[in-house]
């Protein structure tokens, strides 16, 4: 088997309107195609709608076919976008286990939840991998195999899991970037939980779930998607944001009351009840304003019932 990496614009001619590229094939790949597939061509034509939006293609990596389809990785250049002038319209994000991203819009006080299917995907693949592993290892043990090895099926399941999760994270972060562009948001502030992951002990089962969540990948995907629209991306240290009332004078240890964060994702403050993750997103933005020296009134009216946005898996 051979994989091919085509570098440079001289090897790639594009018809941008049609979403088609024509590739000049290197000798080694032409020989491989002739001997393996009896294909005698000097050029390879690829047509896909994704090529329409691409600027200068820098590299194409083509991998051998599996079950009738090829894997192609395209590396292309995107021109730098100048950061937009700050207009005071911001979005804050609280990252969590069951609600992957809970968002707060500073202009209208709207809150919404993205990424609920993530945990469902993780659970499905964990169960399926565990089931197949138990069967496979049982078969090997029955045959007296001393050193148990993994199987092709298990490796493919891990790959499917990785690809499915990556695809879903791209869809969720793309939805968020498009929302910000359409609404005229110029700054996105997300809670920075990297230190929390290292330092907190939340119990064995919660630790296991919490430490497996791909927050770094979410940060990277969000940052480059927002950057394309000139939207500023900030990671804000988020201590006490989930424990302080949205009505407290400030977000900090002095006003933290963990007992007010109740079961089923609720935060109770006297006779007022809010969604706990929405409170977290709201307080992350308050904390960012505090450390930035910004004084701005924010609405708490949308903290009770966030809208749940469904993104197709």
Language model region names:
Residues 3-4, 52, 83, 180:
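Structural motif
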Residues 14-89, 93-99, 105:
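Polybasic low-complexity intrinsically disordered regions
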Residues 66-313:
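Positively charged, helix-rich recognition surfaces that bind polyanionic ligands
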């Amino acid at each position: 088997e051979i994989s091919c990496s085509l570098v440079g614009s001289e090897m790639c001619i594009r018809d941008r309107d049609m979403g088609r590229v024509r590739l000049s094939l290197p000798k080694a790949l032409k020989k491989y195609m002739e001997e393996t597939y009896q294909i005698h061509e000097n050029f390879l034509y690829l047509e896909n709608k994704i090529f329409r939006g691409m600027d200068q293609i820098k590299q194409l990596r083509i991998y051998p076919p599996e079950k009738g389809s090829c894997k192609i990785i395209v590396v292309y250049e995107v021109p730098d976008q100048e950061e937009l002038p700050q207009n005071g319209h911001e979005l804050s994000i609280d990252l969590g286990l069951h609600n992957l991203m809970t968002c707060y819009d500073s202009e209208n006080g709207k809150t919404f939840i993205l990424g609920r299917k993530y945990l469902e995907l993780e659970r499905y693949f964990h169960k399926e991998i565990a089931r197949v592993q138990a069967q496979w290892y049982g078969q090997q043990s029955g045959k007296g195999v001393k050193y148990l090895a993994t199987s092709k099926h298990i490796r493919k399941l891990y790959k499917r899991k990785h690809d499915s999760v990556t695809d879903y994270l791209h869809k969720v972060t793309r939805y968020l970037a498009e929302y910000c562009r359409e609404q005229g948001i110029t700054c996105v502030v997300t809670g920075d939980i990297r230190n929390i992951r290292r330092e907190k002990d939340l119990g064995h089962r919660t630790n296991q779930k919490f430490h497996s969540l791909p927050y770094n990948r979410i940060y990277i995907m969000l940052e480059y998607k927002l950057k394309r629209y000139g939207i500023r991306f900030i990671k804000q240290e988020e201590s006490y944001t989930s424990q302080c009332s949205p009505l407290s004078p400030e977000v900090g240890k002095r006003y933290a009351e963990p007992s007010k964060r109740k079961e089923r994702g609720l935060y109770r403050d006297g006779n007022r009840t809010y969604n706990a993750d929405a409170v977290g997103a709201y307080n992350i933005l308050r904390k960012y304003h505090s450390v930035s020296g910004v004084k701005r009134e924010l609405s708490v009216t949308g903290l009770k019932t966030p809208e749940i946005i469904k993104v197709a898996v």
